[in-house]
Amino acid sequence: MALLEIIHYPSKILRTISKEIVSFDSKLHQQLDDMRETMIASEGIGLAAIQVGLPLRMLIINLPREDGVQHKEDCLEIINPKFIETKGTIMYKEGCLSVPGFYEEVERFEKVKIEYQNRFAEVKVLEASELLAVAIQHEIDHLNGVLFVDKLSILKRKKFEKELKELNKNPKSKS
């Protein structure tokens, strides 16, 4: 397994619309394994392939259990996801491995139902709520070239741009 480089905002790569996966082979399995290792090493709970430079419609989510540990057997590998159903709305404070050090509330669907494939091309259906639903929406947005900062109000977006400018001027201040 290998640690992959996470691409940071404002890289144009993050705006790429990812392509559907048709080949479920050992290369894909290795990419998924490398993505999980990278996500865990970066202390994230989700990672879309485009965040490591792979324009493929796949993502992983590994929420920690109550003990705070992200168990490998809980890792969701979601390939070629499609929303089947969405319900309600909630505000949730989000962050992103591609936008380090910035957290802000974003409006999301409260519940989602998706259809996807696993690493073996088996079709699955998943119903999710709360943090899992938010993480799924956040990562699927990445597959469509959308970042959570795109969903901010004008005021919050200006705050983000200002913080980003400060961080770039003074990179050590926010680590």
From Swiss-Prot:
Q: What is its EC number?
A: 3.5.1.88
Active site located where?
Answer: E139
Q: How is the cofactor bound?
A: Binds 1 Fe(2+) ion.
Q: Which residues form the signal peptide?
A: none
The cofactors it requires, by name, are: Fe(2+)
The answer, when asked if Metal-binding is one of the entry's keywords, is: yes
Q: Which domain of life is it from?
A: Bacteria
Task: Please name the GO terms that the record assigns under molecular function.
Answer: metal ion binding; peptide deformylase activity
Per UniProt, the enzyme's principal EC class comes to: hydrolase
Q: Which reaction does it catalyse?
A: N-terminal N-formyl-L-methionyl-[peptide] + H2O = N-terminal L-methionyl-[peptide] + formate
Q: Metal-binding as a keyword?
A: yes
Q: Output the GO biological process annotations, alphabetical, semicolon-separated.
A: co-translational protein modification; translation
Q: Which SUPFAM superfamilies match?
A: Peptide deformylase
Listed A to Z, the keywords are:
Hydrolase, Iron, Metal-binding, Protein biosynthesis
Q: Which residues bind Fe cation?
A: C96, H138, H142
Give the function comment from the record: Removes the formyl group from the N-terminal Met of newly synthesized proteins. Requires at least a dipeptide for an efficient rate of reaction. N-terminal L-methionine is a prerequisite for activity but the enzyme has broad specificity at other positions.
What is stated as this protein's family in its record?
Answer: Belongs to the polypeptide deformylase family.
Protein name, entry field: Peptide deformylase
Q: Which organism is it from?
A: Helicobacter pylori (strain Shi470)
